[in-house]
């Protein structure tokens, strides 16, 4: 299963991505509340329709704030340039069995690669 980051979704909304379309058709996509939240704050066409459709996609493991704090410490994520929302998404991908994170955010991708949860389907 592929946890698709907001950066990939936003690009897909603007210009459809064949790889993402195939994943969606196969049911191989996961989302996260924070990813949907980031997209909700964007100015995109058909915003409401997009948000309704995103909420239909299965979600990755929910991770508590305490688990994220522990994750940050255990994997020394401080100083990597990722933000707290990114740390939540990364921890969720890490803790969801078989999940991989697809992002176009360079710092998040590099960190996901170090944790062996990255995928790049561009």
Q: What is each residue range found by the language model?
A:
Residues 12, 18, 59-122:
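Active-site neighborhoods of divalent-metal-dependent phosphate/nucleic-acid chemistry enzymes
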Residues 47-57, 67-68:
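Ligand-binding grooves and catalytic loops that recognize ribose/phosphate and carbohydrate rings
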Residues 33, 37, 87-90:
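Non-catalytic, well-ordered alpha-helical scaffold segments
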Residues 1-34, 40-52:
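Short, well-structured N-terminal submotif of metal-dependent ribonuclease cores
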């Amino acid at each position: 299963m592929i946890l698709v980051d907001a950066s990939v979704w936003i690009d897909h909304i603007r210009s459809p991505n064949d790889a993402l379309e195939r994943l969606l058709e196969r049911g191989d996509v996961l989302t996260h509340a924070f990813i949907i939240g980031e997209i909700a704050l964007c100015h995109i066409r058909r915003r409401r329709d997009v948000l309704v459709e995103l909420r239909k996609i299965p979600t990755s493991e929910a991770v508590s704030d305490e688990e994220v704090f522990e994750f940050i410490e255990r994997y020394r994520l401080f100083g990597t340039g990722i933000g707290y929302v990114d740390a939540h998404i990364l921890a969720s991908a890490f803790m969801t069995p078989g999940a991989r994170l697809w992002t176009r955010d360079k710092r998040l991708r590099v960190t996901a690669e170090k944790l062996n949860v990255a995928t790049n389907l561009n």
